[in-house]
């Protein structure tokens, strides 16, 4: 009996193995605030300040050091193709104009390209990374200062400067920087002055007219003195003919006066 009561008490008060307790204590109250960082102890702060790592200063400023050599870039097929195209553009065209490639809409660029193509003027765009090395090794190296930023080329087999300047005036946000005509470097003002020159046919006509006028004047100058001499001789002959007395054919001329002896 006593053993049974002890078993009941033990079963009701002490949990058996493998079973959860019938009563659990749950804590209801404020939790610990962990959002704030705990302040470091003053002694530890001094220790951390003393043992802080101080990196040595470099002897030479890194900005003064030369940049590391860049790895050589492999020449792809596209780069070789662009180089051949650039060489053909500078070899086959007499007029090469350099313009600043500003932000233009696709419609405006297409319209301007169409207007230039009417006069056989082509628009070419090449990357400066390929264009500048070509110019450095060619006779066009004085054009290098023009290639800053984004540029485009206006090329033609014949110097159509007047038509190009007229079209560029209608597009004020596409500035003309300079270029070359027949291997002669011109500035922007040089292109404008070149466009004001007369056409080749008109210049040839003026030259032929000037040469004809000079030839006619030379001919008149060469004929002036002989004609003047002939007129003077003719006038002299008439004066001599009018001054001679009229002598009849049957009459004898008067004898000369005898010379008196002294």
Swiss-Prot record:
Organism: Bos taurus
Entry keyword set: Mitochondrion, Ribonucleoprotein, Ribosomal protein, Transit peptide
Top-level taxon of origin: Eukaryota
Annotated GO biological process: translation
Family label: Belongs to the universal ribosomal protein uL10 family.
SUPFAM superfamilies: Ribosomal protein L10-like
Subunit structure and binding partners: Component of the mitochondrial ribosome large subunit (39S) which comprises a 16S rRNA and about 50 distinct proteins.
Keyword presence, Mitochondrion: yes
Protein name per the record: Large ribosomal subunit protein uL10m
Chief site of localization: mitochondrion
Chain spans, region Disordered: 240-262
GO CC terms in record: mitochondrial inner membrane; mitochondrial large ribosomal subunit; ribonucleoprotein complex
Keyword Transit peptide: yes
Compartmental location: Mitochondrion
Database matches in InterPro entries: Ribosomal_uL10, Ribosomal_uL10-like_sf, Ribosomal_uL10_bac_type
Annotated GO MF terms: structural constituent of ribosome
CDD domains in the cross-refs: Ribosomal_L10 (cd05797)
Compositionally biased region (Pro residues): 253-262
UniProt transit peptide range: 1-28
């Amino acid at each position: 009996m006593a053993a049974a009561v002890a078993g009941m008490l033990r079963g009701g008060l002490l949990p058996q193995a493998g079973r959860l307790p019938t009563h659990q204590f749950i804590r209801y109250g404020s939790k610990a605030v962990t959002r704030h960082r705990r302040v470091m102890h003053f002694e530890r702060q001094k220790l951390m300040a003393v043992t802080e790592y101080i990196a040595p200063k470099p002897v030479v400023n890194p900005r003064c050091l030369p940049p590391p050599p860049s790895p050589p870039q492999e020449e792809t097929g596209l780069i070789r193709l662009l180089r051949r195209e650039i060489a053909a553009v500078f070899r086959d065209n007499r007029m090469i104009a350099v313009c600043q490639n500003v932000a233009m809409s696709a419609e405006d660029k297409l319209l301007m390209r169409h207007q230039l193509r009417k006069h056989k003027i082509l628009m070419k765009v090449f990357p400066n990374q390929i264009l500048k090395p070509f110019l450095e090794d060619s006779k066009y190296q004085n054009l290098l200062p023009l290639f800053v930023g984004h540029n485009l080329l206006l090329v033609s087999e014949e110097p159509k400067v007047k038509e190009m300047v007229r079209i560029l005036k209608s597009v004020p946000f596409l500035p003309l920087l300079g270029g070359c005509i027949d291997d002669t470097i011109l500035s922007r003002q040089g292109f404008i002055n070149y466009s004001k020159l007369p056409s080749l046919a008109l210049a040839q006509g003026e030259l032929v007219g000037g040469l004809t006028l000079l030839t006619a004047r030379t001919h008149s100058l060469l004929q002036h003195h002989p004609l003047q001499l002939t007129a003077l001789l003719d006038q002299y002959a008439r004066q001599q003919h009018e001054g001679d007395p009229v002598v009849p054919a049957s009459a004898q001329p008067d004898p000369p006066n005898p010379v008196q002896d002294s």
